C-alpha cells in the first residue's frame, strides 16, 4: 500500500504532546448544528444553552429545590464547545469517513482479513511486552499472539509480571512460558520490549510509573489502554519522557469480552470489541500505524480516534455512570420500589435486572432507543414517559458531579488512595473491595436464573425502560456538552453497556459484571451506585408518586434527538456476532469462575 503523507491528527489542543507530535497536531472544529436535546427548536443552535437550577417553592414552603427543577435557559454569552473532527492518516490501513448526526468522523474498520498487514504496522518492533495480568492483559496478550501467528509475524508477545506473582500460573495456562521467552519478570520485559503495553491497575501505574519510564528503551513505544496515567501525571504537573512515543488503544469493554468475542469470531470476520486510539507522543512517525495495528490485532470491529485526555474523562465517567455504577443503582432502587408495592420478588427481579440486561439491551443494541420506545403500547409509553421525565434531571445531577470530579482529578486521586488502602499501613488494617451481590435481591436473582429458559430475554417493563433510557440520555448529554465526539459518546454510553457489560449481569448478576472489570471501574461502581440509588429514590420516584406532570419538552427532545441517527450508523458497525456469556464461563477472572 502506498505511503501517505506524515501522520496528522485533528484533535483537541488540550492534550500535552511532545514537540514532534505537536507539529503534526491541528485542531479542526466543525460548527455545531445540533439540537442538543433540551429544547426542541430549529436544528441550528442560535443561542447556547446552559443548566440552571431554579428553586421551586411548594405552597407554604420557605425554600427548597432539586435536580427536578433544572431547566434550560438561553445564555447567548456562553460558548458551547464546537464539535471537533478527529482526522488521521495511516500508511498501512485504510480509513473511512462516517457521518454521525452531521459530524464527519474517521474510523478504521477491522477484520481478520487485515491481519496480513500487521507486520507492516509493527515494522521495527521485535517484542511486545504485555505488563500485568488483570482484566485487559490476558485478553489482549492472547489476541495479539493469535493474530500475529495468523499473520506469520515473528514479533514476540511476552508477559511481564512481578516476581512471585500468583498470575504466573494463569499466564502459563494461557500458553506463555519462561522456556520459550514469552513470560518473565516485568522489569526485564519492559527493558527488552519495543512496544510496552502497560496493563497493570491504574493505582499501580500511579505508584510505579517512574520506574517503568526508567526501564524503557529510547524510541520505544508506551502503550496504554486507559488515559488514567496522563490524568495522574497532570495532577502532579508532570509528563511522559520525551524520548518515547506514547499511544493508547482502549477497548470499549471489559477484558473478558475482548477475548470472548475474538474467539467467537474466529469463523466470522470482524468480531470483537470496538476501540478508541490516541497518539499522545510520536518521536519517529510510527505511532499511528502501531496503534492501529494493535487495535486490529485485538479484533476491534472499528477503531476511532480520540485523545488520552478525552479518553480518561469519558471512560472513568462512563463506568461510574450507565455502564456500571448507575445501572447497579437503578436496579437496586427499582427492585425495592416494586417489592414494596406488592410485586413478588421474582417478578421484581425480572422487571429490573432481566428487563434491562435482556430485551432492553438487545433492542437498543440492534435497533436503538427509539425502537425500544416505539415497541411499547400506548399505556406503556405513558409509564415510560412518567419515569423518563422524573428521572432525567436527578440522574444528570449526579452525572454532572461525577464528570467534574473526574475532570478535576479528584476521582483519579480517589482511585490511587483506594488502591493503597488495599494493604496494611500506618497501623491500620487492609481494606480490599468487598462483595456486592450478597443481599436478598441478588439471591432472588440466582433463583430466577436457575429456572430461566435458554435464550429468555425477560419482560419489557415500561417504567424500568424509562428510568434506564433517561439516565443513558442524560449521560449522552453531559458528554456532548463537554465536547466529546459522537463515536466516543455512543461507545461509552450505549454500545459498551448493551453489547459488552449487561450480558455479564444477565448471566450471573451484578458482581459478575462489575468485578470482571478493571480495579478503577470496580472502585467507581461501588462508590457511585449508591448515589444514583439515593437520588432516584429521593427525587425521581417521589415525583412520580406525587403526580408530578410529565415534562413534555423532555419527551419531545428525546424523540427528536440527533443521537438516534448516530446510534443507527454505529449499529451497522457492531460486532458480527453477539457475545455469548454463560454462568460457567471460563474466560473470566479466576476468582469469578464457578467451581
From Swiss-Prot:
One of its GO terms (biological process) is isoleucine biosynthetic process. NADP(+) binds at residues 129-136, 162-167, 201-205. Substrate binds at residue 518. It catalyses: (2R)-2,3-dihydroxy-3-methylbutanoate + NADP(+) = (2S)-2-acetolactate + NADPH + H(+); (2R,3R)-2,3-dihydroxy-3-methylpentanoate + NADP(+) = (S)-2-ethyl-2-hydroxy-3-oxobutanoate + NADPH + H(+). Mg(2+) 1 binds at residues 315, 319. The active site is at 226. Its main location: plastid. Binds 2 magnesium ions per subunit. Residues 108-306 form the KARI N-terminal Rossmann domain. It comes from the Eukaryota. Pathway: Amino-acid biosynthesis; L-isoleucine biosynthesis; L-isoleucine from 2-oxobutanoate: step 2/4; Amino-acid biosynthesis; L-valine biosynthesis; L-valine from pyruvate: step 2/4. Belongs to the ketol-acid reductoisomerase family. This is Ketol-acid reductoisomerase, chloroplastic. It comes from Spinacia oleracea.
